[in-house]
């Protein structure tokens, strides 16, 4: 089937924050359709390693390897494993890292991947080729666990009612397709369509859970701190408030802004060792009105960036993310 072309979000802003330079080495931790990778390679005579855990991107990566004249290499791995990817190549430092967090339009557009309630397909949602599926989650997890996932990862206020409807429905027959889950959620919420489809937040929450997206992001941020050379740049684009909040907390703490940003909704960042980053963006950067009008995915995008200094990476810091329902528990039940 034909799919809509993937448009990299905030390309000019990403390149402005990264400032690619000749002779440098960069990581595109979320290769996807290769938009950022091509942009970086075009901006300077540099080298780049693309990383992605989705095996479906391999043909695109292979094309870029062949066209890059030895300047591009690819590894199929989660971006949290970028340290291992570099170590396998005898590399211990890079000059910049770009991360584009969340599902890509390519994945959403492919019905067989099961990411979208708008396209009938198997209830999968995995970005990698292995691990539990969204169907495994909705058919095996306890009602309270599903409710917690929907509430925390989807910020769905009707989480408990939706979880109850799901458990009632699965007792009659396993929930195996995207359209059936969407129909169950719609019934649970009364079928009211506001600005978004009733199933939007539930699908988002399941995707985040199945792919351990917040855990992956937390580990990738900590790996970036260890891998960036002095004056190396970290650029992160997020599309969800939970992700942006995590990036903001990490960068503010590593920049030594202890106590800053505290409010009744957001706890103040605790003091730590010597700052290891300097902020390039004091506030999140959003896409321009023109880009948001042309590319709907850009509307929720937030970019944050920072520069690494010579201070050692923090070796003992609080975890950025603790899963509300460990994915390992579901894996053990399969």
UniProtKB/Swiss-Prot annotation:
GO terms for molecular function: rRNA (cytosine-N4-)-methyltransferase activity. GO terms for cellular component: cytoplasm. Keywords: Cytoplasm, Methyltransferase, rRNA processing, S-adenosyl-L-methionine, Transferase. Its main location: cytoplasm. It catalyses: cytidine(1402) in 16S rRNA + S-adenosyl-L-methionine = N(4)-methylcytidine(1402) in 16S rRNA + S-adenosyl-L-homocysteine + H(+). InterPro entries: RsmH (IPR002903), SAM-dep_MeTrfase_MraW_recog (IPR023397), SAM-dependent_MTases_sf (IPR029063). GO terms for biological process: rRNA base methylation. It is found in: Cytoplasm. S-adenosyl-L-methionine binds at residues 34-36, 52, 87, 100, 107. Its EC number is 2.1.1.199. It is an enzyme of class 2 (transferase). Belongs to the methyltransferase superfamily. RsmH family. Specifically methylates the N4 position of cytidine in position 1402 (C1402) of 16S rRNA. This is Ribosomal RNA small subunit methyltransferase H. The gene is rsmH.
